[in-house]
Amino acid sequence: MPIHDWPEQERPREKLMARGPTALSDAELLALFLGSGFGGRDAVQTARDLLQAHGPLRVLLDRPARELARLPGLGPARSCTLAAGLELAHRYLAAELEHGEAVGNNPAAVGRYLQHRLRGQAREIFMALFLDNRHRLIACEELFHGTINAAPVYPREVVRRALLHNAAAVILSHNHPSGDPEPSSADTRITDELQQALAMVDVRLLDHFVVGEGRPVSFAERGLLSPPQPRLFG
């Protein structure tokens, strides 16, 4: 049955207007981006087909636009619409960190942003947020990329980037493609090495977030960061 023949309260657009976007299923939300169906199936059925064959939702939407365009029912126009929607969501979350407020005072916003950037990635990515002396965001960079199990991390490069940005503080993050956000012993070891290396140039490590499924794990919240050491000189 075409969507326009459905009861009005069950049509995705009307349901969203009446009850809000959280009332819609993944397939119904995706159908609103598609606009119409494919191969004799309506937009919701097409969305369900895509999710069943290529999902779940994050796996489907993590694909590059050129790869999405090759999937049945999408094509260049719809894949670009989906990619644009994701980029808007990314910029919306980034805006929480980019309006001159102290990032270090808003760990929830940092966690949401990093979760959006890193969760569901097929390989490990190591990122750094560089902050000024009032803990406002200067830059956010992906520094290292690895395999499904690990990304090589070089403290010297992190320090170099911090100095380049004249950063006073840094927040680190990486993802676990396995989905388990619990820090490993290697995570703890490299965090300690990075904290010591940054301290040598008077840059403070505020936190290290590990992103997987669910809520990111914060080293600072867990008490896993070493206390700042007093400077010997100066």
Swiss-Prot record:
GO biological process: proteolysis
PANTHER family, A to Z: DNA REPAIR PROTEIN RADC (PTHR30471), UPF0758 PROTEIN YEES-RELATED (PTHR30471:SF3)
Family indicated by similarity: Belongs to the UPF0758 family.
Short motif (JAMM motif): ranges: 174-187
Full protein name: UPF0758 protein Smal_0281
Bilayer-spanning residue ranges: none
Pfam families for this protein: RadC, UPF0758_N
Sorted UniProt keywords: Hydrolase, Metal-binding, Metalloprotease, Protease, Zinc
One function term, GO molecular function aspect: metal ion binding
Sequence positions that bind Zn(2+): 174, 176, 187
Domain spans labelled MPN: 103-225
Record-linked InterPro entries: MPN, RadC_JAB, UPF0758, UPF0758_CS, UPF0758_N
